[in-house]
Every structure is written in C-alpha cells, then in structure tokens.
C-alpha cells in the first residue's frame, strides 16, 4: 500500500478512536456517577487539556524517531484506551471511591497519548515530502471526518449493540491495527521491524481475547456492584437497564439508580395512580408519561371503566423488555399487552406537542430531574403543555422525588405546577427500598378529596393510609423555593444539592 495513503487512512482511524474513548469515558461517568452535564463537561475539558499536553510533548521526539514513536504510541493507546471502560466497570463494582481517581487517570493518560498522534503523523508526512498546505488540509479533513463517523456510529450502533466495554476494546483493536499496518508499510525504514510487528500482534491478540470475554467480566463487575445476581442488562441509546433478582425480590436499575423493588413497588404505584383515579370516578381515558415498566398501567387497568390507556415512553428497549420477558411481564400483569393499552415510544414533550387528545387522568412517572434533559420535563412550559391535554375535571399526578431527602427539589415541583396555573395537593408515602417518597396531584379545580375507600383491590392503600399520605410532619414542611423554568433549570440544582447533602 502507498505510504502516503496509509498515513492518511491512519489519521481517519486514530481520530475516530480518539473521540470514541472520550465519548465512552464521559458516558460511563454520567451513567455511573449521574449528573451528565457535569460529567461530560469535566471529562471532555480534561481530555482536551491532556491532548494539548500530549501535542506539546511531541516536540521533544527526534525526527529520526518519529515513525517508531508513532507506532509505539498507537500500541499504547490501543491498550490503555481499549481496556479503559472495562477497568472502570470493575473499579466501580469494587468501590465508587477509587473509581473517580481511575476515571480521571484514564482521561489524562488517554488524552495525552491521543494528543501526540496527529502531530507525529504530520511530521512523518512532512518527512515524506508532502507539501505543507496539502499536508495540513488532508490531515485535518480526515481528522474531522473520523470524528464525524464515530460521533454517529457510537450512539446509534456501537453502544447499543456492543456496550461500552466492547466498544472501547474494538477501538483499541483499531489502534493496534494501525500500528501493525504502518509497521508493515514502512518496514524498510524500521531497524527493529520484527520486534515491532511481534509487539503489535501480541497487543492485537490480547485485546481480541479480552473483547471475547468483556461481557462476562463486566457482568461479574455489575453483580458485585448491585449485590444481587444480574438477570438482565441492556444498553439502549437512551439509558442502561439492569434487572437483578434475589429470591422473591426483582429490582430494576436505570443508569445505576434503583427504579423499583418488587417487594414494595405496590406502595409506590398504588400511591402514584389510585388517588387520582378515585378523584375522577368516570375516568375513561388515561395518559401515562414514562412508566415504561408497565407497573403504573397495571394499577390503571384495575378500573373497568377505563377504555383507553396511552403510555408514552422514550425507550423502546424498556417497553419491549417489560412486555416480552416472562418474569417482568408477570410483575405488571401483562399490562403492556392489554388490548386497552397503546404504547408510544417517543419523547413525552414532543408527543404532547403533536397530539390534540384530551385525557381524564394524566400520570407522569418520569425519572428524577437529575440532569437538564430530564429537568425540562419538570418545567413550567412542560406542565402548561400537559394541562392542554387535561379534561376540565381531570387530574394530573407527578412523581416528585423525596420530600424528606430532597425537600427543595420536591417543593420546587409543587411551585412549578402552581406557576403553570394549576392547583396542587402534595402527598407522600413511605417505600422501604426508597425511603419517604413524594407525589403531587394537580388540576384546574381546587377539589382534591382524600379517598375514603378504593374501588379496586389494593395491597397497601386504604382510607387510613390515604389520609396519612396528605399530612406532612414539620421536617417535611413546605419550603420557599423557586419554580423550574427552562432558562434556569433551578430544579436540577436543587436536586443535586439535596442529594449531595444526603451522601455526605
């Protein structure tokens, strides 16, 4: 193969690999540590900084050693970048404390060696007689094309199909392959060609073996982290789902955060759904935003007068899993396959904007507002949009985090609903696996009669427990906090601050 062409192809590959490691490490940090904005910002910022350091260090490499050093760096990037995700999974499974140290160590080291690649390629091309203006334009063009390719392939294909660990290893193999190919093309200029080729083959073999066993290793690491045996895991473009089971306790985790335990989820879902359904006795049309596990839908379908339930959940993997898995569909009693159900996989706000339907009860069972993407779904504009789809005597209910552990966030949700010109009735319930958890009822009228009885079978709620839900002790009393608007996303700040105080 032509030497010039080999190096240009190498630029495309190393650029793809360099961005891939950055995306993988940032995504892992956001999944495992939460707060995606902070994690992506800190990882990308530190990565770019370390790339600058790496680029600076290349000036100390002698011209006669440039080609040899480029090949060595490709092997080094392949090994460190390739194992980065798997090592981080294992570290997090053992303990979250050294995870942060290892995370930023990988960012610094991988960023530094990636930063050395392009300057060294340009120097090699320059030594081969490439004209400067052509050299710069070609290298940067293929650099940016490689970045574009991986930015599209990673979220749409690689992460969902291979997962984080195997994606990183695949790019590590690409880096090692570049080293091997470059060594072969330039073997006449490499005094120690055989030794270099042997090292490249060893690295390729090691990465290939680890790639083959990566899922098993990450599976073991996740079992160590979650404690209970992992029975299902998937990585969609939107989130990472993990289901664990120990004896009669099945648990769902999204991005490492517990969503429910089968031992006590009835407390949560009865509290979420039944008060609103009892307050609208002739509710026929119900909308559920989120709730892709089908557990809220299970409670709604207890009411025989319900004619239609529309469930809007962003992640098709979530709804498909809880529809087709025998174990999980048993938990929701087959609600997602019920003839009254209509499941839509779409963004909740986008779907509401495109729909003209009105509903008697709207249940909002979305993940906590831990980042700006979720925070917008708890904003004044969002609740105004929801209200446009509510019948005059209808009710909205929102899961609203914990009024005990995250009081500022909880009461901000109440203030946000009120800023959207809705009347509210806050309430809470104790869920053993979560602790104290909060909800907010909202509607156009001011009447929120506490149910004196329930027309459907319950395992937790009755007249007494329902009355207790609407009483708040002094340590959960209302706080003076701001409503959440898109331009300030104050709710995300409240949520982070509240939970950080709990974790200290």
PLM regions and their residue ranges:
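Alpha-helical transmembrane segments of multi-pass membrane proteins
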Residues: 1-233, 237-257, 261-328, 333-432, ...
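SAM/dcSAM-binding transferase cores
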Residues: 445-504
